[in-house]
Structure formats: structure tokens, C-alpha cells
Amino acid sequence: MEASLSNHILNFSVDLYKRLKPSGKDTAGNVFCSPFSIAAALSMALAGARGNTAKQIAAILHSNDDKIHDHFSSFLCKLPSYAPDVALHIANRMYSEQTFHPKAEYTTLLQKSYDSTIKAVDFAGNADRVRLEVNAWVEEVTRSKIRDLLAPGTVDSSTSLILVNAIYFKGLWDSQFKPSATKPGDFHLTPQTSKKVDMMHQKGDFKMGHCSDLKVTALEIPYKGNKTSMVILLPEDVEGLSVLEEHLTAPKLSALLGGMYVTSDVNLRLPKFKLEQSIGLKDVLMAMGVKDFFTSLADLSGISAAGNLCASDIIHKAFVEVNEEGTEAAAATAIPIMLMCARFPQVVNFFVDRPFMFLIHSHDPDVVLFMGSIREL
């Protein structure tokens, strides 16, 4: 069951990331999102979707049955005692217009599988007050890291319901970086240009892996408790991130993550960074195949028999900060591979001094919670 959730989220993560990354001549800009958060919101919508609408949402979640709700339920039930050494909080809520009556089966499923609270509100009479209430709840759940999720105008008197997922993560490194070892260092933006940034440093044993097909080396930095970790995907050269993004697939990423082994005496240099991104996902999800959900063709009859429901957009906002102590992050959705068999040299330098990808994931089950890339600091 849990392995299935791992597969759903991993496949969705890679598909989504490839849509969010810079494309064409636009090679600038950072990316950060929570695939888990977006997938959870979509899965809650899937529970009320029928016909082609359900098929389209299920397809991008790589799910072909209703068991995805059980998979989410199993994972969410673990959270209270899952990783006592880190803060990992996930909350779901449905805001429903007080004159709109969703089906009892739907609200029961949300409560059972997603531990979702259901709140009746007055969209018709005071939509902006509801918007502020949603924002206040998200801000509380994410420890004030996600503010103003819904901008003015995103909610109006015609809104019937809002499905919200919020996720908050704060983990201390299992082996923290010493602030005294942080020094200015070059981060290469292009082969010709670089920027001085605060570069953290430590030497230790880390799991590493290499994929010659993707021309990337991976290094895992565990958080306390070893139930969660950050993985850095470092391309071989300054312009290698675009190559990695173009050729990345879920099976390749899975093989890379599963093929890492402990490497001793690694000199690790990692820049401190902070990111915040707000994304309207309507166009992205429509391009991925979820077309009916945002139009009059939407079939959400599992939510209400009255019909005439469709989504206006899916708003996602994510935040991450990485420093010497650890990481704070928040958000309000088989191919053969050549792994390097030879051991790494006796002393390995892993200098994150060029554009790179990263992800934060849980273990047992292995679920991608956050994913992103840094091109600019």
C-alpha cells in the first residue's frame, strides 16, 4: 500500500517538475513546490470527480483505482509518531458555502482518508472574509511561513467550496554544519559568471550515488531521526541542470535514490538558501491532461448531485530555508540505469557551487514531500 503511494508521488513529482522548470530560451529562475501537497489536494478532488474528469485526474496521479485514498490515509495516520525528531505537519480542510450541501459520502471520505476538517462558510455574503480566514488557517498550520495564499479576487460570491492542503516541515540536520565553518564562496551561475554566497562546510560520511546517463551525482543529508532527508542532485558541469531536467524520469530517479551507498570522508560544501514561490497551477495541470476539471465539462457529481461545479484554479505556495541547523519548509499537490559501480575516491569533494536540484523526502514509505532546483542565489 505504502509502496504504491511512493510510486504515485514520485511519478507525479517528476512530471510536475518538468512542467514547472524553465523552458526554451528561458533558463533562469528557481523552482520549488510540494508535490505531496498538490497531489493530496488533487486526490481530494478526485474523490468527488466522476467520468472523464476522474480519469484525467487519476492519470496524472498515476492511479488506476480508488485505493489512492487508502494510501494517503495510511501515510497520514503514521505522522503523529512518525518522526519525533522533526516537525512534519500536514493538514487538510474543506471550506464549503453554507447554502451548498456536499454529499455525506464525500465529506465522510475526506474526514476518514485525509483527516480533513469541513467548515461551512459564507462565500455568498462575504467572500473576502472567508479568503482571509483561509489564509489565517494556512498561516497557522505552516508556522507563519505561508502567508496570503489566496490573493484578493481569487474567491468571490460564486465560490462553492475550497479544498486546502497545508504542509509544514522543520528538520535539524543529523550532523549540523558549524556556523564558524561557513565562508563566502563562488556559486557559478554560468560558465562565465559567478556570485559570492554563504557556503556551509562539513566533512563526514554521506550516502552518495552517480548516474552517468543523467550526468549527475547525488548526496543525501539526513535529518535527525533518519526518517527524512534532503537529497542534492549535482550535475557534472555548470550548465548540466538543463540536461538533467530533460532526461530525468521517475524510474531513473528511483534507481539513483535506491542505489546510493555510504561514502566516507566527503568534503561537503552547500550554500545557504531561502526560496518562496507562488504558483497558479491551472495551465500546468491542463497541459498535463487535467482539462475538464477547470471547465463546464467538469463532472464533480460525487461532491454534489446538483452539478455545475468546476475549479477556477489551484493555487500553490511553497517556502524553504536551508541553513547550518537544518531545513524549514512549508507549502499550501523500469528503465535500466547505469549506476557507478566503482567506489568514489578516498576523499570526495562534493561542492554545490553550481545550479542543482534537490528534494526532501520521507523514508518508509519513501514519499517526495518537496522538490526544487536552484539556478540563482
UniProtKB/Swiss-Prot annotation:
Family classification: Belongs to the serpin family.
Recorded coiled-coil stretches: none
Keyword match Cytoplasm: no
Induction trigger: Induced by blood feeding.
Effect after changing residue 339 to A: Abolishes ability to inhibit host serine proteases, host intrinsic pathways of blood coagulation and fibrinolysis. Does not affect the inhibition of TNF-alpha release from PBMCs
Residues annotated as glycosylated: 11, 226
InterPro entries: Serpin_CS (IPR023795), Serpin_dom (IPR023796), Serpin_fam (IPR000215), Serpin_sf (IPR036186), Serpin_sf_1 (IPR042178), Serpin_sf_2 (IPR042185)
Expression across tissues: Female saliva (at protein level). Female salivary gland (at protein level).
Source organism superkingdom: Eukaryota
Subcellular location: Secreted
GO CC, alphabetical: extracellular space
Predominant localisation class: secreted
Function noted in UniProt: Serine protease inhibitor with anticoagulant and immunosuppressive properties that can modulate blood feeding of ticks on vertebrate species. Strongly inhibits human leukocyte elastase (ELANE) and porcine pancreatic elastase. Moderately inhibits human tPA/tissue-type plasminogen activator (PLAT), coagulation factor Xa (F10), thrombin (F2) and trypsin. Does not inhibit human plasmin (PLG). Inhibits platelet aggregation. Inhibits the intrinsic pathway of blood coagulation in the host. Inhibits fibrinolysis in the host. Inhibits proliferation of mouse splenocytes.
Name by which UniProt lists this protein: Iris
Note: Inhibition of LPS-induced TNF-alpha release is independent of the antiprotease activity of iris.
PROSITE patterns for this protein: SERPIN
Organism in which the protein naturally occurs: Ixodes ricinus
Keyword field contains Glycosyltransferase: no
